[in-house]
């Protein structure tokens, strides 16, 4: 998936006057491509001489150029002992020596995912359109919260089916998602493919439904929420970083592999609100230093990792009032609306507003020992 290759090229005496350009030939020699690895050219502009406002070498601007070179390689998933399927008291269990996945046939959701009696995911995914209100949402908050009730979702089960094949079990769940007393919503289809090797592929398709005339001008986000083991506090991700990024606020971020704690991924605003989002994430891992959960996306998604829920952010008036959750809260977004500047300026641009729309997202989760995640994330499979 991703690898950071650092090549520093310093040019002395290469002067470019304002409004002009100059061609510089970079002394990059040929190198062997690694399979399933992305390459980027990172250009950094630094302060040449010390000034009152910045020391020499201070980074002024960074630009990242994706290199259109890639070597793809595909593998066949290994197989393990046959998956067993049992059902009782509204719980469907798929398991073998490498994986245990439990589903609620009543509530139409994944209850847990793990192995050897240890839960890596403790709930999810469930669809979500809500984010804790930001300052720039101040003129939308009344409609969102008291007219469309986006903070009060309802997801009803329509069907659950299970199909056993040679080395995998496919669980399909259909739901209807909406918010209290609304005529709009989404017909959702969740397909969980549990492989005997211990991986589980999750495919989610949503079809927008409008049975009336009223709907929000735009939604804060379209995505899903999952919950992870509360002890998985060490995070690594391949996506934009190192700080938070949003669709209209990412000039300071570049693609790379980054590490932090879950708490460290929070942007601690004076007034609690949505924060810590990362755009264009290809994979992430959370772990306890030994065991971890690896999640690989088929297409780039937005990511939030936190030790608190959106509801606790919305409720708190000060950072010390934010209530801790019992799990690691995982947001994966198909799209999240931009930030705009509507507390004192303009709304988000139209292209940065998430409208009621069809969507599709897919990702694969698996247990991965800490230290193996980059190697595991690079693997691509034939199916």
Language model region names:
Residues 15, 27-36, 49-51, 65-383:
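Beta-strand/loop-rich accessory regions of lumenal/periplasmic or secreted enzymes
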Residues 2-58:
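Intrinsically disordered, low-complexity Pro/Gly/Ser/Thr-rich segments with frequent PxxP/GP/PP motifs
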